[in-house]
Amino acid sequence: MFLFKLAFLNITRNVRRSLITVMAVGVGLAALIFLWGFNDGTIEQMRENVIRLFTGHVQIHARGFEKSLSPELFLAQREKVLIDVAANPAVSRITERVKCEALVGTSENSRGVLLVGVDPERERQITDLEDHIEAGRYLEPDGNREILVGDRLAKKIGLDLDDKVVVMTQAMDGTLAGYAYRVKGIFHTGSQQIDEVSVYITLASAQELLGLGEDVHEIVIQLSDRKGIEPFLEWAKISLGSEKYEVLKWNELIPEVDQWTQWAEAVIGTILIAVMVVIGVSIMNTVLMSIYERTRELGVMMAIGTSPSQIVQLILLETLILEGLGIILGLVGGYLVTIYFGEVGISFHGVEEAFSRSYMSTVVFTKVEWPHVVQSVITLILLTSFIGLYPAWKASRMEPVKAIYYS
Amino acid sequence: MFIKAENISKVFQDRSLPVTALKAVSVDIEEGSFTVLCGPSGSGKTTLLNLLGCLDRPSGGRVFLRGEEISALSQEKLTRYRLRKIGFVFPDFNLIPTLSAVENVEYVLWLQGISGTERRKRAAAICERFGIGALIHRRPRELSRGQQQRVAVARAIVHKPELVLGDELTSNLDHKTGSELMGFLKELNREEKMTFIYATHDPVMIERAGRVIRMQDGEVVSDEKTRVHA
Ligand SMILES: Nc1ncnc2c1ncn2[C@@H]1O[C@H](COP(=O)(O)OP(=O)(O)OP(=O)(O)O)[C@@H](O)[C@H]1O
Ligand SMILES: [Mg+2]
């Protein structure tokens, strides 16, 4: 207690300098917490965007379909799978799709696309394609000669609403199948992949085109909670059998989000270290100054019997108190700011294009992820304690006689 | 013999030039004695005092305390030695400015691992005895020089050391205050059998010592026992 008191009194000697140090720690930590909050918020929204835009939580295919997109790899025993999946309490919604590579052509142009046959009613409950229609309208349930195209594709091959296009693909039996469709809607999702390469028709017309009958290529599942994905995969492995089916989660279908997450965390990790070094140097400077200013006093303390290790303890304690106050300030400040922008959001409407291309939202809602906060605080404590060792060690190595008589 | 210095010398390295502060000095100090070191500035008084007080190690020669060679001890051991057996009064008092008078005194007891209540009781009692009982919660800068000096002496003797060393003990005090302080010290010397060694220029202090060691250019030039009078 006496040591603590002494350390505390020493800190209050130069209140302004101590305050500046506490602020440096606090602001640095708050900035880190906010930065993590920004990143975690962004990534959380990216995840939801990807899920809502296209993938759902989990998809079931015939094994090998995701890679090959072979039309003949339709889901075996479709009805049984549907019944089994629907019976799982974690599942909230299901839809089915037909997917194949196709050629979309006008009289002048043609282009390779991913043809997706969707059930308009069930699809809109899982993905938000409908919200992205910019011109025209969404597919009618029985709109069997209707097609939706992305704005990029429309531009590339010169399509407008109500234009006629021919879609050609390889049918189940290996023959070339082709139908004419009318463009009923043009969508813009912001995802280059979707806007340029994907076209949508109704499930029924896709089945007809390919000669699939009632069969489909893909079952898309939305669970009541994203946390339920892993347990669902476990369940699917046992219940459906892994040799006939591939059950893929959203981040296996679109790995970019995970890659982005890793990249962003590496960047923040680097910033974390830079901030730590700045904070560390600031603390070290303060403590070194304060030691320098009381060389004589420390010399006297050692002369009358204070051991070098007690001097180390004292100086470390002073460092830790400064740091502790800074951490409290940083935690409270960083938390409040992050929470605030989690409510209000930070708008990036000016740079929409860059954001939407990577599935980001243009309004970022920051989010406090405690593991990241804890990680920042622990790194801060470890690194600055380590840095604090130097002044402490230096102080303890002083020669009392020199300190008392020649300083 | 209580303290015995055998041919101790001290050479300081001042930048690149060696400065010989002490040349082969030998002295014996008896237990319970009251000795003064005097001599011109730069004659080596402080240096000798620090060597006798285990604050520094000699460049040559040996120092014994009760037959134990302290000049050979490690820094850590010397620290413990000083804490248990020696009390220091430094020039300009050198109190810890953030601590109150009583806390300055308490500090030594805390270093010795004495519990809080016991510590405060003993520190307050010493301050009382030195006539500063009413001022114990003041910081050093709120005390007069004479009062600060009493706190410094209280700090030096609160743990009842065997040896008390004082450097320029009264040099910043007026005649009356210095004389009063001397009275206290002589009392302690008599009652507690503490051994005192002082370095000073002050004729009043020299006059009241039991033994006067005169130094010049790092050597002892005279060493005489006087008839002790209080
Ligand atoms: N740490 C040191 N580095 C260099 N020279 C030193 C050091 N300590 C003492 N000296 C030198 O040693 C000599 C003796 O110094 P010392 O302090 O013992 O003298 P003193 O008798 O106490 O003088 P004063 O009466 O002025 O206090 C002086 O010449 C001094 O400059
Ligand atoms: Mg001196």
Where do the PLM segments sit?
Chain B
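A short acidic/small-residue loop/turn micro-motif
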Residues: 227-229
